[in-house]
C-alpha cells in the first residue's frame, strides 16, 4: 500500500484492476516480490495517495487499510511524500527553472514552500497511527516500511533536474526528514524497513545509471513519470525487499 513510489506510474504494464488515478504497475516492487516468492498479493497502492487515503476513502476508492484482514501476513507501506508536497514541489520548481533557463514560457504550478515543522510532526503522528492500525487489523503480519528512492544527487543538480540551489537543497531536506520519520515510525512499532533512500544514492536522476526519472526537456523527454522510479529503480527496491524477507 502507499503512494506512487509504491504503485509505479509510467512503468509498463498497468495492473488491469487499477482505478484510473492509481496507475499501479504490474512491475512495481510488490508485484515483483509476490511473483518471486509466490505470494498472494492485494495491491491497493495509488499514485497521489496521502496518509489520509490509507485511513479514509479517496473519492470512490476505499481506504487502503480496508484491504487488511487477520489473515494478512505481510504489509508493505510507502507513504508520506504527498503529505509534504515533495514531488509536487520538485516538479513546480523544475518547471520554473527550465523556463528561466530557456526563456520558453510554460504553464508552471505555483511554487510549494518548504514544509513547516508542524507538517513534519503531523506526518510522523499519522504514520505512527497507520502502523498501529495495521498491527491491530493484522496482528500476525510482518510490516515493512519502504522509504523513497533518492531523486537528487547529494549535492548540486544537472540538466535532468533544472533546479536552483535553494530548491534543490529544500528538496533534499524534505527527503531527509521523510526518511528519518519513516525510520523512527518503523522502529517504534517493531516494523522492518527497506531504506531505499540510502541504497539508491548514486542512482539519482543525474546518474549515468539512474533509477529515477528526471524532469522532461524538449531535447530529452522522459520515458515514464517525472521524478519517479524507473523500471530499474523499482527492481532494485524489489531486490532489497526480497532479501529482507528471505
Where are these regions (language model features)?
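Structural recognition of the beta-strand scaffold that forms the well-ordered cores
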Residues: 1-2, 6, 40-45, 73-78, ...
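Short, solvent-exposed beta-strand-terminating loops
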Residues: 7-8, 81-96, 147-154, 198-205
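Short, well-structured alpha-helical segments in soluble
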Residues: 55-71
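A substrate-binding/cap region within the structured catalytic cores of diverse enzymes
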Residues: 71-111, 119-120, 126-133
Amino acid at each position: 500500500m502507499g503512494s506512487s513510489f509504491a504503485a509505479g506510474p509510467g512503468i509498463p504494464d498497468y495492473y488491469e484492476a487499477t482505478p484510473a488515478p492509481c496507475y499501479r504497475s504490474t512491475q512495481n516492487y510488490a508485484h515483483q516480490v509476490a511473483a518471486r516468492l509466490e505470494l498472494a498479493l492485494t495491491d491497493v497502492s495509488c499514485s497521489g495517495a496521502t496518509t489520509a487515503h490509507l485511513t479514509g476513502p479517496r473519492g470512490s476508492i476505499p481506504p487502503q487499510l480496508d484491504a487488511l484482514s487477520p489473515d494478512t501476513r505481510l504489509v508493505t507501506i510507502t507513504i508520506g511524500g504527498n503529505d509534504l508536497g515533495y514531488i509536487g514541489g520538485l516538479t513546480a520548481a523544475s518547471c520554473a527553472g527550465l523556463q528561466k533557463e530557456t526563456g520558453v514560457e510554460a504553464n508552471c504550478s505555483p511554487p510549494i514552500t518548504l514544509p513547516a515543522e508542524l507538517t513534519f510532526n503531523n506526518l510522523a503522528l499519522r504514520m505512527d497511527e497507520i502502523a498501529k492500525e495495521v498491527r491491530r487489523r493484522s496482528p500476525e503480519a510482518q510490516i515493512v516500511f519502504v522509504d523513497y528512492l533518492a531523486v537528487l544527487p547529494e549535492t548540486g543538480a544537472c540538466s535532468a533536474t533544472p533546479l536552483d540551489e535553494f530548491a534543490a537543497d529544500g528538496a533534499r531536506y524534505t527527503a531527509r526528514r521523510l526518511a528519518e520519520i519513516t525510520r523512527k515510525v518503523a522502529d517504534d512499532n517493531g516494523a522492518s524497513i527497506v531504506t531505499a533512500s540510502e541504497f539508491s544514492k548514486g542512482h539519482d536522476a543525474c546518474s549515468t545509471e539512474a533509477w529515477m526519472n528526471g524532469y522532461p526537456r524538449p531535447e530529452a523527454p522522459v520515458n515514464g513519470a517525472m521524478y519517479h522510479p524507473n523500471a530499474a529503480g523499482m527492481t532494485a527496491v524489489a531486490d532489497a525487499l526480497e532479501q529482507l524477507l528471505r
